[in-house]
Amino acid sequence: YFDCLEVLYDLTGGRVDIFDEPLVQKMGEYIADFRLQGDTYVNFADAPHRIRADARLIARFGRRVRSDKLTAMAASLWTDAPYRFWIATTPYRHIKNLLEEKPAAAAYTTENRIYYPNLQVFIAKDARTGLELAAKGGHNAESHNHNDIGNIVLFRGEEPVFIDGGVATYTKTTFSDKRYTL
């Protein structure tokens, strides 16, 4: 999504600029809000809990939407290897990544309590103990929910204390009208 908005911005010389929309900023900050420690992120449904986030993409997003949260996150993830994501991205992003400069280092912190009411997600982080709890309400009609009415994960640092058991092997039944019998 960000790449599409950035291409529109670049090709129109900034005349098409959607980055000041509050929803666009909130979409970008989602990754910062869901980051726990290091490469560990809150994961629900069939998402992995470890990802390698693209610091340069996050830096550009932060600059475009004027988000200190994203800029600080990008600085904390920065490496001197802009080619780290070349297999999974586009030539346009490769060029942008090569040209991106490291943002000024700022202390990366997130709020202690984060709530996304439309997603029914609550995240609580305690820097003193290193405990981080995430809970999600839900129902089976949500995308990617298969017999899933909620979830809770608890981490201490980068180590899981309590996690969702994960997904079973997907079969054609998983995506059929019989999925609730699994």
Predicted regions and their residues:
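Carbohydrate-active enzyme catalytic cores, enriched for enzymes
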Residues: 3-162
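C-terminal, non-catalytic macromolecule-binding modules
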Residues: 162-182
